[in-house]
């Protein structure tokens, strides 16, 4: 099976594991996925992630509250292989009035919507996470 949208696959795996309250989820490795996971960890949406180089996979540790509530309430892939969505710095969207984040692929790497505004760069809107 040929996978055309690796990011959508990773987000779907995270969403499904999160809904089932799994502690970890495994995804195939790629540089873009690692960059996205760094942002998710920095923003507090995941606990951690580990790269297993010899198996070419990433193990993502999901994060829950003390009451076993999900930290990630929702994920939505915005840019798709058939329809790329780009934004300028003036039109960067706010997710749930600032409660969530937009992942934006810029020439300075993968940034959140807030960091992209601070850096004054636009780019491809990859996903919304709240």
Swiss-Prot record:
Annotated Gene Ontology cellular component terms: ribonucleoprotein complex; ribosome
UniProt similarity note: Belongs to the universal ribosomal protein uS8 family.
Protein name, entry field: Small ribosomal subunit protein uS8
One Pfam family here: Ribosomal_S8
Function: One of the primary rRNA binding proteins, it binds directly to 16S rRNA central domain where it helps coordinate assembly of the platform of the 30S subunit.
GO biological process terms held by the UniProt record: translation
PROSITE patterns: RIBOSOMAL_S8
GO MF terms held by the record: rRNA binding; structural constituent of ribosome
NCBIfam families: PRK00136.1
PANTHER family per record: 40S RIBOSOMAL PROTEIN S15A
Assembly behavior: Part of the 30S ribosomal subunit. Contacts proteins S5 and S12.
């Amino acid at each position: 099976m040929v996978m055309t949208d690796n990011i959508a696959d990773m987000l779907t795996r995270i969403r499904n594991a999160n809904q089932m309250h799994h502690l970890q989820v495994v995804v195939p490795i790629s540089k873009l996925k690692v960059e996205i996971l760094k942002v998710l960890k920095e923003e507090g949406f995941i606990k951690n992630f580990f790269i297993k180089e010899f198996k070419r996979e990433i193990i993502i540790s999901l994060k829950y509250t003390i009451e076993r509530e999900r930290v990630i309430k929702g994920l939505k892939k915005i840019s798709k292989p058939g329809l790329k969505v780009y934004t300028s710095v003036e039109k960067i969207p706010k997710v749930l009035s600032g409660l969530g984040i937009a992942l934006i692929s810029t020439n300075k790497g993968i940034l959140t919507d807030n960091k992209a505004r601070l850096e004054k760069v636009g780019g491809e809107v990859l996903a919304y996470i709240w």
